[in-house]
From Swiss-Prot:
Residues 259-277 have a biased composition (Low complexity). This is Inner kinetochore subunit cnp20. It comes from the Eukaryota. Pfam families: CENP-T_C (PF15511). Belongs to the CENP-T/CNN1 family. Component of the kinetochore, a multiprotein complex that assembles on centromeric DNA and attaches chromosomes to spindle microtubules, mediating chromosome segregation and sister chromatid segregation during meiosis and mitosis. Component of the inner kinetochore constitutive centromere-associated network (CCAN), which serves as a structural platform for outer kinetochore assembly. Modulates outer kinetochore KMN network activity by regulating interactions within the network. Transmembrane segments: none annotated. Gene3D superfamilies: Histone, subunit A. InterPro entries: CENP-T, CENP-T/H4_C, Histone-fold. Component of the inner kinetochore constitutive centromere-associated network (CCAN) (also known as central kinetochore Sim4 complex in fission yeast), which is composed of at least cnl2, cnp3, cnp20, fta1, fta2, fta3, fta4, fta6, fta7, mal2, mhf1, mhf2, mis6, mis15, mis17, sim4 and wip1.
Length: 479
């Protein structure tokens, strides 16, 4: 009899629904939990796999294929594919329409085309060539001016166009009447010509201009004071009489003027030369009057003439120290009741400045004198160098034997070099702090960096230990 195994209720109600199968337990790794989304637990789909492969293939470079295409080539290909026929711009279309449509004479007179600088220059050169080729043509109908660069921008009937540097070709015409007719033909509505022989001071009024142009000499205060000043200033003033405040006329134009002629210029030159020749005699008379002392004395000028130069005086003082008497300082604190300069000084009582030879003799006497103070040596930081006695004491405290004088000299030079180096370091600290002086805090900081000062050793203890009483600074009293 075959035995049948029946599941008991206990076996059917096992804990498998709580623990889960083995395949389900594989999903629970230490980095994942039950609460992760199901999309992360799924396997990679074919679509996702293809996308990843495409991205990796783009990132990976194929070594056997030469990459000749650039982004610019791609843009060029796209533009050719999109726009097969070139589309004209609106500016080009308008210019092409203007070229094809014929213009009448009235339209040409109304619109004056703006020329570029190159075209204007070519027009200028063509005008010069025409004038040189046809000298015998009628000059009454010819245009005497040359077209300037700014001709299309303003009205051509302006007087300033005729007095540009290129427009001075009018000076070739000597006759003033012919030049007047030509100017009236070229400039409409001109009441008085610029080169008429009526008057040198006249008003040129143009109908189209808002501001009239005055043809006048210099201002009143400059013309009235022509006799004053130096001969050069008077000569410049006479020349400036024939210059307008707006433009300057050349001498070739002014030759036609009755007020400006060769005789007048010659007379002016002769008067100028006579005035220049009178200058030495005037100077001699001034010197004679100065000697006679007829002028009022100027104390500042006399003091400037008779005083030493400040720089030379400082150099002499730095070289030697003069011996002073005690009698000079007796009346130093008394008040000065009388003025410094009462009256002009006489020639006999004037200060006599010694010569260089006298100064050299005085300096040599002072150098040879036995009463000469010993010079003190100073370091770069403007403090006294340690004296040799202090260096000798320090050296004897460290050594048990006697020290020779040559060793002391070497020690002094070494101490000087040490102080120079420290002065450079301290000046760097002061510059960093934007100060011009070296303070005690800079020294303390430097000694801290050199491990000379610590919490156990202070600066005052080092001063008491190494510095003598003559060098050590006085103790600060605490209040």
């Amino acid at each position: 009899m075959a035995s049948h195994n029946y599941e008991t209720p206990l076996k059917s109600s096992s804990f498998q629904h709580l623990v889960g199968t083995l395949s389900q337990r594989r999903h629970f790794t230490p980095s994942r939990s039950r609460y992760t989304p199901r999309s992360a637990q799924r396997t990679v789909t074919p679509h996702k796999r293809r996308a990843l492969a495409r991205r990796n293939s783009l990132a990976r470079r194929r070594s056997n294929v030469f990459s000749a295409t650039t982004p610019r080539d791609i843009l060029r290909m796209l533009s050719r594919a999109l726009a097969k026929n070139p589309v004209p711009s609106p500016a080009e279309s308008e210019s092409s329409e203007r070229r094809h449509t014929p213009q009448t004479n009235s339209q040409k007179s109304q619109k004056t085309p703006r020329l570029s600088s190159n075209k204007r220059r070519t027009l200028k050169n063509d005008a010069k060539q025409r004038n040189s080729q046809s000298p015998g043509t009628d000059t009454s109908d010819a245009n005497l001016t040359i077209q300037s660069i700014e001709a299309p921008r303003r009205a051509p009937q302006r007087l300033s166009d005729f007095f540009t540097p290129d427009g001075r070709r009018v000076s070739n015409i000597r006759d003033s009447l012919i030049s007047e007719k030509r100017l009236e033909n070229n400039i409409d509505q001109v009441q008085e010509s610029a080169l008429s022989t009526a008057s040198s001071n006249r008003l040129i009024d143009l109908k189209n201009d808002e501001v009239p142009i005055f043809r006048i000499p210099l201002s009143d205060y400059e013309t009235d004071d022509m006799d004053d000043g130096t001969p050069l200033q008077r000569h410049v003033a006479t020349l400036n009489q024939y210059q307008s405040p707006i433009f300057n006329l050349g001498p070739d134009i002014l030759e036609d003027e009755p007020s400006y002629s060769s005789r007048a210029s010659r007379s002016r030159q002769s008067s100028l030369s006579s005035r220049l020749s009178e200058l030495p005699s005037k100077r001699a008379s001034l010197e004679i009057l100065r000697r006679e002392n007829t002028f009022p004395a100027d104390p500042i000028q006399e003091f400037g003439e008779k005083a030493y130069n400040e720089r030379e005086l400082m150099e002499e003082i730095s070289n030697f120290e003069p011996l002073l008497d005690d009698n000079l300082l007796e009346n130093a604190n008394e008040a000065v009741n009388s003025p410094v300069v009462d009256a002009p000084m006489d020639a006999d009582s004037a200060l006599e400045i010694p010569n260089d030879e006298d100064n050299g003799e005085i300096l040599n006497k002072l150098k040879d004198s036995p009463f000469k103070k010993p010079k003190r040596r100073y370091s770069k930081s403007s403090t006294l160098v340690l004296p040799e006695t202090n260096i000798r004491k320090l050296a004897n405290s460290y050594s048990q034997k006697k020290i020779a004088g040559s060793v002391i000299e070497e020690l002094t030079t070494a101490s000087e070099l040490f102080f120079k180096q420290i002065a450079n370091d301290l000046s760097a600290f002061a510059d960093h702090a934007h100060r011009k002086t070296i303070d005690t805090q800079d020294v303390v900081l430097l000694m801290k960096r050199q491990r000379k000062i610590s919490e156990k050793k202070s600066l005052s203890s080092l001063m008491q230990q190494y510095l003598s009483r003559e060098i050590a600074p006085p103790a600060i009293k605490r209040t």
